[in-house]
C-alpha cells in the first residue's frame, strides 16, 4: 500500500480501459481494479460486428484486445472488490474486501451498468443466444 498512484480506475470495461490508456499517455501512474472479469460486460457479449475496423468478433476476444493494449502501457490490472473509499490528507485510500488497500490521488469510477435480468429458468443459458437485453445492440441479429 506504500505506492500512491496518480489515478486508480475502478472497472475494466471499455470506459475504464480507455481511461487507463489516456492516463498512461499523459504520464500518470495508474492502476485498474476489476471486481469480476477483465473487459467488464463486454467480455460477456456473445458477438460484436459493429465495431469499426474489427469485423465480427466475440466480446471476450475484443475485451482481451483492450486488456492487451492496456498492458502494453505497463498498466497494472488487478482483481479486487473495492468496498470503501476514504479521504486522507493527501490522497484517497481504497479498501478491498480481501483486506488489501490502495492509495490514489484521483479515482475514476467506471463500473458500468447492469440490466434487469429475466427471472426465468435457464435464462442465463440463452442470453446472447435468443434472449437479449439491448434492442439497439442486438436487433440486427433478429432480422429476416
Identify the residue ranges that each predicted region occupies:
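N-terminal Rossmann-like FAD-binding beta1-loop-alpha1 element of flavoenzymes
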Residues: 5-31
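Short, acidic/turn-prone active-site loops that include or flank metal/cofactor-
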Residues: 37-38, 56, 136-137
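Glycine-rich, phosphate-binding/catalytic loops in enzymes
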Residues: 26, 48-49, 123-127
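Residue-level detector of alpha-helix initiation sites
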Residues: 13-15, 37, 113-115
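N-terminal Rossmann-like dinucleotide/flavin-binding domain of flavoprotein oxidoreductases
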Residues: 43-101
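Short amphipathic alpha-helical segments
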Residues: 20-21, 44, 119-122
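FAD-binding core/adjacent interface of flavoenzyme oxidoreductases
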Residues: 1-10, 77-144
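Conserved acidic E/D residue at the C-terminus of a beta-strand in Rossmann-like folds
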Residues: 32-36
